[in-house]
Amino acid sequence: MSTYTQPVMLLLSGLLLLTLAIAVLNTLVPLWLAQEHMSTWQVGVVSSSYFTGNLVGTLLTGYVIKRIGFNRSYYLASFIFAAGCAGLGLMIGFWSWLAWRFVAGVGCAMIWVVVESALMCSGTSRNRGRLLAAYMMVYYVGTFLGQLLVSKVSTELMSVLPWVTGLTLAGILPLLFTRVLNQQAENHDSTSITSMLKLRQARLGVNGCIISGIVLGSLYGLMPLYLNHKGVSNASIGFWMAVLVSAGILGQWPIGRLADKFGRLLVLRVQVFVVILGSIAMLSQAAMAPALFILGAAGFTLYPVAMAWACEKVEHHQLVAMNQALLLSYTVGSLLGPSFTAMLMQNFSDNLLFIMIASVSFIYLLMLLRNAGHTPKPVAHV
């Protein structure tokens, strides 16, 4: 059976268009708020509203998928995000945008949960790593192209909203030509997210998603600040961030394939060790290009491998709930990690960015090394 079936390819095609729209809005909304002379705290609160929507969307989507299936859940999520886009143009103001960014956050999280769950349910224990690697590649390529679009087109609010909303709705079109089957058995009771978070045999995967959120959130949010404080120009900062993200894109497929072939525990151990090495290299002022490349290649691929690990440990009908738990764990890590690291950097040294990344990675490595490798055989394999 082919890994990249027609439903999978069409799903990823639609996701690419949605990711473009999401990346453009996430970049421009803070700038539009600043142009409206809103204070820094107001910009921060609007951003928090979006992430709060992410959390709510993550919690709701499992129920929606069980009720109406993957296809219609995907359509609904896309329409919710499109409404969040278009709503920004109806009334410009703090409270209005607070509400619309919350709506967009709900839609965005629903899209991620639907797509990730559909891919995991479509795959097996032998190819799930490659499926999630393809998903992450589409995500990062879409984010990169979205940033490129921002630099090439008009960034005026009323110029951007029509085509961004159009992109979101166009993301629905590929799935009109296929049906992604929801293979959760109807006679199974709903699985709670809490039970997935407490599942002992999947704990390494859950912890891996939290660590991944801390690492990626810190790199995305604080790496530009670190480089700026080192005297790097804005143009060069863009170049070094491109190196970091490009490494993440290039690492997805080979690492996903290695995880499928040699086992996810071994690959996770190597990945985390490489993240620690990359962090030490940055602290030692070694050649920045190779240091950032190995940091990006290993750090940006932690999430899909940890997710695939956790999904091996549950029954097939529990995959959607497990995906919700993993996305929730990642979101919590990406929210708390940068906040704590930023406080350390402000009060002590910018080098705390890489000390923090190396420290949490080392803790996770100890967890991985404690696992003797005689875990139960994967059960979510059909």
Curated annotation (Swiss-Prot):
Pfam families: MFS_1. The keyword Membrane applies. It is a multi-pass membrane protein. One of its GO terms (cellular component) is plasma membrane. Residues 1-13, 66-78, 123-130, 178-203, 256-269, 312-324, 369-382 are cytoplasmic. The chain crosses the membrane at residues 14-34, 45-65, 79-99, 102-122, 131-151, 157-177, 204-224, 235-255, 270-290, 291-311, 325-345, 348-368. Residues 35-44, 100-101, 152-156, 225-234, 346-347 are periplasmic. Its main location: membrane. One of its GO terms (molecular function) is transmembrane transporter activity. Keywords: Cell inner membrane, Cell membrane, Membrane, Transmembrane, Transmembrane helix, Transport. The keyword Transmembrane helix applies. It is found in: Cell inner membrane. Signal peptide: none annotated. Belongs to the major facilitator superfamily. YcaD (TC 2.A.1.26) family. This is Uncharacterized MFS-type transporter YcaD. It comes from Escherichia coli (strain K12).
